[in-house]
Amino acid sequence: MVYLPLQSFVLCLINISQEGNSMITQELKDRLIADYPKFEDMTHKFYKKEMSIADYKGQSGAYGSYAERGANSGMSRWRFNGGRMTRQHMQFLADSIRKHNLQHVHFTTGQCLQMHGLDGDTILNLYKECYDHGIYNRGAGGDNPNVVASILRGIDPRETLDITPYATAISEFLLEQMFYIKIPRKFKMGIDNGFDSTPHATFKDLGFNLTKHNTFDVYACGGIGPNPRIGIPVAHDVQPEDVLYHVKAMLMVFANHGNFKNRGKARTRYMPAEMGGAEAFIKTYEETLAMVKEVEQLTINPADYAYEITKTGKRDNSVENDRIHRQKQEGLYYVEYHPAGGDANVEHLLSALDYAVTLDQVEARIAPDQALFFINLTADEA
């Protein structure tokens, strides 16, 4: 067991101005790039055949990159909070495709982008260029993957609460916590809006399922793969502003009770049995949650992360089809691009990006089913 004093993980909240609906501090930004030289060194060694595939994989994943079969090329994984790509991100993606001649662009189930078939220098250049454009890939391929969120959050005509502020807050919180809490293996999270189940919140390592009361039911220790498990309900009717307390509590339980000795059994879904069963796990979870609430101030102010869609259009039902659907905003629509297996046709993607960046308030979102959605379009734009 790894003992982690609660006090050593107290989050230091700094009052900073909003930047693109983000509360990431400059201190954290600096930390996300501080160990880039280590990544640079290992990548140069690997592509010079001075490091084994296994050794490289064990380290490079923390920087969102893995070697590909044959060890002559690799991939670069780009992390987007809940799959959201701003207009600036879309322009950067289009520019990068052209600059680096990217031929294999893949949409992942974790709402990330992956660029395949890259040489070492391109991987390193993309890592730095992504950072300069507010895309933080540190941890994206390691034990701290992207938080998956409902793709239609904020625009779904059925929803009663926009979960965007809470999904963003969780994503940014995890970026900071990965430097403080050592967990034995990857920790997948999902948050949904109560209608869209694609985040699979009920069978993630930790998941938040929105209820009809605009509160969250919380599930833990779920997952697919070997020993698949539906998540254990650990809390009901949690106020949205309180979700970070549950994130911190689960991270600490995983750090203290996860299996560091056997990587094959290091995921959270193995943990309850090793702790004596679901009841024993829930008891520990609740005790840890109480301690976190006593020591830390992690209540979310949704206004810090929210952004308003002010664009409107004229409703035109004739444009709706299998790929074009109506948003809850007056006269606005979203378009779905769903390539087979999530592998984009680069020419088609570039055409879409080039057009989208010319439009007001349009953004793209990568879906958990490996599609790309362009949202906030008028009927004519769609």
Predicted ranges, named:
Residues 64-70, 101-107, 256-261, 323-329, ...:
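Short, flexible, solvent-exposed loop/turn segments with mixed acidic/basic and small polar residues
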Residues 117, 121-125, 129-134, 255-321, ...:
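Terminal amphipathic helices with adjacent charged low-complexity linkers/tails
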Residues 1-22:
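Short, Lys/Arg-enriched N-terminal segments with co-localized hydrophobic residues
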Residues 58-66, 99, 143, 216-223:
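N-proximal short alpha-helices
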Residues 71-72, 149, 224-231, 259-266, ...:
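Short acidic (Asp/Glu) and glycine-rich catalytic loops that position anionic groups and cofactors
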Residues 45-51, 73-216, 245, 335-382:
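Small-residue-enriched alpha-helical segments and adjacent helix-cap loops
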Residues 23-94, 283-355:
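Gly/Thr-rich phosphate-binding loop signature of adenosyl cofactor/nucleotide-binding cores
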